[in-house]
A protein has these predicted regions:
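Membrane-anchoring alpha-helices and their flanking helix-loop junctions
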Residues: 1-93, 105-237
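Histidine-centered phosphotransfer motif of kinases
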Residues: 96-99
Length: 237
């Protein structure tokens, strides 16, 4: 197998497994916390708020993209010729090709940083960025096979993840915000569960006690129930 063939196989494998990657990094962060030195763990309300803000920014990007995609799909079901292009090029997609991947990176960067373990924060952030890049590359290869030269021309004109605000964008024809919230509910509650779990572990390591405050227990139970219901009620793609 040539290096190009191995790279192609790797990126397509990472793309297929992309939804499992956050669980791997959260599990690795849990292990890093359990084997860390308590006084070396970054903690505090300001640090936690910054990590939450990172994840919230990622959700904002994802929800914008999902709202536009949901509207596009509903229009195309009613009228297959409603759009000239077979793939999204309007709204947020006119400035960045992969807003879902970019948003997803920010969403899960929050829990990675929230571990507060210095070496893990750096290494896991870089490793997750590499995984997201491979997933985007794998998706791009599949779309090039499907759409051909029109998609390649769009790739040449549109950045992958860092928006070009100097480039004139195309307004989104519409958005279905409620549909976007339903589509991303499982990701939202999964990220919330990761924050609660890592927060409980940090309390154990910093305070050297398993007597976790009741508020963490209540929050954890509520998040787990919400996650279960979001999985059961998840709309089919």
């Amino acid at each position: 197998m040539t290096l190009d063939e191995r790279y192609d196989r790797t990126r397509k494998f990472v793309y297929r497994q992309r939804r499992r990657l956050p669980a791997v990094f959260v599990a690795a962060g849990s292990v890093a916390l359990l084997f860390s030195t308590p006084f070396m763990i970054c903690d505090g309300p300001v640090f936690g708020a910054l990590c939450l803000a990172c994840s919230c920014a990622g959700f904002w990007v994802r929800w914008r993209a999902l709202a536009q995609t949901a509207y596009r799909r509903s229009r195309m079901k009613a009228d297959p010729a409603a759009f000239a292009e077979p793939f999204s090029v309007e709204g947020i997609h006119s400035r960045v090709r992969y807003p879902l991947h970019a948003g997803g990176f920010l969403v899960w960067l929050g829990p990675i940083l929230f571990t507060g373990v210095g070496w893990f924060m750096v290494s896991a952030s870089l490793a997750y960025a590499l995984c997201v890049w491979l997933a985007m590359s794998g998706e791009e290869a599949l779309r090039l096979e499907k759409y051909g030269e029109p998609y390649r021309a769009w790739c040449d004109a549109t950045p992958a993840v860092i928006p070009d605000f100097g480039k004139p964008g195309r307004p989104a024809p519409g958005r279905l915000r409620a549909a976007a919230l339903r589509c991303d509910a499982t990701v939202f509650w999964s990220a919330a569960a990761a924050f609660v779990w890592l927060g409980a572990l940090k309390f154990r390591m910093v305070d050297l006690s398993w007597h976790i405050p009741a508020v963490w227990m209540i929050a954890g139970g509520g998040v787990i129930l919400a996650l279960i219901f979001s999985v059961l009620l998840r709309p089919s793609r």
